[in-house]
UniProtKB/Swiss-Prot annotation:
Matching NCBIfam families: GTPase_YsxC
Binding-site residues for Mg(2+), renumbered to this chain: S38, T60
Residue span(s) of domain EngB-type G: 23-219
Keywords linked to the UniProt accession: Cell cycle, Cell division, GTP-binding, Magnesium, Metal-binding, Nucleotide-binding, Septation
Described function: Necessary for normal cell division and for the maintenance of normal septation.
Molecular function GO labels: GTP binding; metal ion binding
Annotated InterPro entries: G_ENGB_dom, GTP-bd, GTP-bd_ribosome_bio_YsxC, P-loop_NTPase
Name of the protein in question: Probable GTP-binding protein EngB
Cofactor(s) the protein needs: Mg(2+)
Gene expressing this chain: engB
Binding site residues for GTP: 31-38, 58-62, 92-95, 159-162, 193-200
Family assignment from sequence similarity: Belongs to the TRAFAC class TrmE-Era-EngA-EngB-Septin-like GTPase superfamily. EngB GTPase family.
C-alpha cells in the first residue's frame, strides 16, 4: 500500500497569507485545465473523490492541500488529522489555460500561483501534468520557466497516453525529455527535470509516478524500511 493512499483533505487557501505554517515537504501538482490533473491525483491516492475537477474549466482558483500521515487511510474516516504527525503535503494548484474567468480573477490567480511556486520554502518539487497529445503549450513553458530558477525538481506526467499509438508515445516522451534537457543552470548543468507516460484509463505509469513522488518527498526510505520490517516479520512467523 502506498503512503499516498493516506492522502486526505487538509485545507484550501486563496491568499499566500493563508498558507499553512506546517514545515513538512510539499509537492505541488500543476497543469493546464483538462490535462487530467485531478484524475491523476485521485488515482495516485487510490481515492475516487479526493480531488474534484471543476465542471467549468479554469474556474477553480484556490490552492488545495492534502495531508499525508496524521490520520487513518481514506477520506471516509472521521477522525481528526493530527497535524504533528503529518509527513508531507500534496498540493493541488489551480488549472490554467482557459479564458472563462474575469481579468481580475485571472490576475489574482497568476500572482498566487507564481508567488507560490517561486517562494514557498516547503515546496520540494513540482509535478507538471501535461496532455501527451498536446505537449508543452505556452502556458506549460511559462510554468517551467517560473519554477526552473528555484533549482528544485520537476517531474512531468504525460497523461492520456492511451490515446497514442506506440510510435506516438515514444515521440511524445522523447520530445518532453529533449525540452526538459534544454533547461540548464548558470554553470550549464541540467536542472533535475524528468518525464514519464501515464494513462488513467489503462492504469499505466502509476507505480513509476508513485515511486518518483515519494522519492521527491523524501519518503521512499520510509517505504523501504516498512517493507524490510514486514519481510523480517513474515520470516520470523515462518520460523
Amino acid at each position: 500500500m502506498s503512503l499516498l493512499w493516506q492522502a486526505r483533505f487538509f485545507t484550501t487557501v486563496n491568499h499566500l497569507r493563508d498558507l499553512p505554517n506546517t514545515q513538512v515537504p510539499e509537492i505541488a501538482f500543476a497543469g493546464r485545465s483538462n490535462a487530467g490533473k485531478s484524475t491523476a491525483i485521485n488515482i495516485l491516492s487510490n481515492q475516487k473523490k479526493l480531488c474534484f475537477a471543476s465542471k467549468t474549466p479554469g474556474r477553480t482558483q484556490h490552492i488545495n492541500y492534502f495531508s499525508i500521515g496524521g490520520a487513518h487511510v481514506g477520506q471516509h474516516r472521521k477522525d481528526e488529522t493530527k497535524v504533528e504527525e503529518i509527513r508531507a503535503m500534496l498540493v493541488d494548484l489551480p488549472g490554467y489555460g482557459y479564458a472563462e474567468v474575469s481579468g481580475s480573477a485571472k490576475h489574482h490567480w497568476q500572482a498566487l500561483l507564481g508567488d507560490y511556486v517561486q517562494r514557498r520554502e516547503q515546496l520540494a518539487a513540482l509535478v507538471l501534468i501535461v496532455d501527451s497529445r498536446r505537449p508543452f503549450t505556452d502556458l506549460d513553458i511559462q510554468m517551467l520557466e517560473w519554477f526552473a530558477p528555484t533549482g528544485k525538481p520537476i517531474h512531468c506526467i504525460l497523461t492520456k497516453s492511451d490515446k497514442l499509438n506506440r510510435n506516438e508515445s515514444t515521440n511524445a516522451l522523447r520530445t518532453a525529455n529533449t525540452l526538459l534537457a534544454s533547461y540548464v543552470d548558470e554553470y550549464g548543468q541540467p536542472f533535475p527535470f524528468t518525464a514519464q507516460l501515464f494513462s488513467a484509463l489503462k492504469r499505466t505509469g502509476i507505480d513509476e509516478a508513485n515511486d518518483k513522488i515519494l522519492e521527491l518527498l523524501g519518503l521512499n526510505d520510509e517505504v523501504s524500511e516498512e517493507s524490510d520490517s514486514k519481510t523480517a516479520g513474515d520470516a520470523e512467523k515462518a520460523e
